[in-house]
């Protein structure tokens, strides 16, 4: 059946999922970060009783609510697409992938839904303590939601805690905690959530600088800037640290992705990390003999240090990963891509033989087939690969997006330091150049987050589940025209929703925060 699937169906299914995910991630990080910033502001109000902080928190809550509503809508569509466009994937790993999503829906979403109502409508109706708890629990619910979604995504990057059941043709969970607490999941969670805090901090600083540029709400703007910049600086530094941890996990579990991130074709000991480079557009395949770069600047030995925590360690490149033959940590020798493909075909053949023997009631043949399947099941997904070059992701896209993310991450650290120095040491309200810098930094926060996800998802192609299920085998057998139609429907729908959100937010920003009374209470 899979041989008859039109490649354009694969491309359009991927495009539709990417479209939904990109739009969804426009809203999620701002929700995660604003929850922390407005929680801190309300905590100050609770401790001081100064209603200025109450009105400050309420203003950012209003923007949080607008953003939260659109994020939920896009998230629901994203989850439904697993069943509509990726039914083979859903069947193959539904027992594992469904568990985190179910927990996210039952626990996190209902926590958010319960306490967000108190947060918005409970002012002066419940005690200040309970309202503060509701605000923080709303943010906690959003963060828990992110945890389980990212656990599911991390499992796709590094499938653990499961085994293949040939009787059901499914991968089934055998160790929930291995799935929930894998190092890949932990690093991905902290890196993604902290990047959301950075984006929200950039957003708050940028909006507040707009007020200063307009010579409005000076007290409100400066107070918001100071809190947001501290949150942003801490998050940006920690995000860089967790990014290092994520890089190490990628090197261990997805070496081809790491090689694509670096445009790294020929492995070596003491490998350097490319700080900046221009790829050779004429290089099309790993073995075409052409140089990978037109120009590059390297940090010596840094890639080995990142990937193996040893500046002298060998790091395999794309050619090494395709040809194999290099020593592994366990003392064995790496298989070539072609050898993995042959083992994958053996696994698929053994699975078919097992099902046929079971259907015929031949237990002896079934046991033999099951043994062969168990020996080769780790390479099951490779059996669907037709050419070794399919195992190489889009190198230019992965390489450049990785550098966009890293460069912007460094810029944000510098940005928050400058903002804090000016806010505490100078009169930031008079520095119109800084107002423009802050406002123009807002879209860069969104760009950094999207670039990170492009690296994570495009860098792991051709796999829907690393080494187990290629994207080409994960899709539903649909009519290409129907996928194209829904793609453009979603494109229009999401664009309208985005325009509506931006319009409502701009209206709320132009209106500004409520005026606090002149006295404290």
Model-derived features with residue positions:
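Polytopic transmembrane helical bundles with strong interfacial aromatic enrichment
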Residues: 1-521
């Amino acid at each position: 059946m899979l041989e008859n699937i039109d490649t354009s169906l694969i491309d359009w299914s991927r495009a539709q999922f990417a479209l939904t995910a990109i739009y969804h991630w426009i809203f999620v990080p701002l929700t995660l970060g604003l929850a922390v910033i407005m929680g801190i502001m309300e905590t100050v109000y609770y401790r001081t009783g100064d209603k200025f902080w109450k009105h400050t928190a309420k203003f950012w809550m209003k923007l949080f609510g607008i953003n939260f509503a659109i994020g939920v809508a896009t998230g629901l569509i994203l989850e439904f697409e697993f069943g509509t466009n990726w039914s083979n994937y859903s069947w193959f790993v539904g027992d594992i992938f469904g568990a985190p999503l179910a927990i996210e829906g039952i626990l996190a979403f209902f926590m958010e839904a319960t306490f967000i109502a108190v947060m918005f409508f409970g002012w002066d109706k419940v005690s200040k303590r309970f309202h503060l708890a509701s605000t923080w629990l709303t943010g906690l619910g959003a963060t828990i939601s992110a945890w389980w979604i990212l656990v599911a995504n991390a499992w796709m990057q590094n499938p653990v805690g499961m085994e293949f059941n040939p009787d059901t043709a499914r991968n089934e969970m055998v160790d929930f905690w291995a799935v929930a607490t894998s190092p890949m999941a932990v690093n991905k969670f902290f890196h993604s959530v902290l990047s959301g805090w950075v984006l929200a901090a950039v957003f708050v600083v940028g909006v507040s600088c707009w007020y200063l540029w307009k010579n409005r709400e000076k007290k409100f703007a400066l107070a918001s800037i100071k809190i947001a910049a501290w949150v942003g600086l801490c998050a940006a530094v920690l995000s860089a640290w967790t990014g290092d941890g994520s890089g190490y996990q990628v090197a261990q579990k997805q070496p081809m992705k790491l090689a694509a991130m670096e445009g790294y074709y020929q492995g070596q000991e003491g490998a350097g990390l490319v700080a900046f480079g221009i790829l050779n557009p004429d290089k099309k395949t790993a073995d075409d003999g052409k140089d990978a770069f037109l120009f590059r600047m390297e940090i010596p030995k840094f890639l080995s240090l990142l990937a193996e925590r040893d500046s002298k360690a060998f790091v395999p490149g794309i050619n090494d990963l395709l040809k194999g033959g290099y020593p592994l940590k366990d003392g064995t020798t790496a298989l070539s891509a072609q050898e993995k493909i042959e083992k994958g075909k053996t696994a698929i053949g053994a699975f078919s033989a097992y099902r046929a023997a079971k259907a015929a009631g031949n237990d002896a043949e079934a046991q033999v087939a099951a043994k062969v399947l168990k020996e080769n099941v780790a390479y099951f997904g490779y059996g669907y690969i037709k050419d070794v070059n399919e195992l190489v992701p889009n190198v230019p896209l992965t390489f450049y997006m990785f550098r966009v993310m890293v460069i912007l991450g460094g810029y944000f650290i510098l940005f928050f330091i400058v903002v804090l120095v000016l806010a505490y040491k100078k009169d930031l309200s008079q520095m119109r150049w800084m107002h423009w810098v802050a406002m123009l930094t807002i879209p860069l926060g969104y760009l950094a987050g999207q670039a990170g996800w492009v690296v994570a998802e495009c860098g792991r192609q051709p796999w829907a589940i690393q080494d187990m299920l290629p994207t080409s085998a994960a899709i539903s057998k649909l009519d290409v025209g129907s996928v194209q139609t829904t793609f453009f429907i979603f494109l229009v729908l999401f664009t309208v929703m985005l325009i509506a959100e931006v319009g409502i937010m701009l209206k709320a920003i132009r209106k500004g925060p409520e005026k606090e009374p002149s006295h404290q209470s």
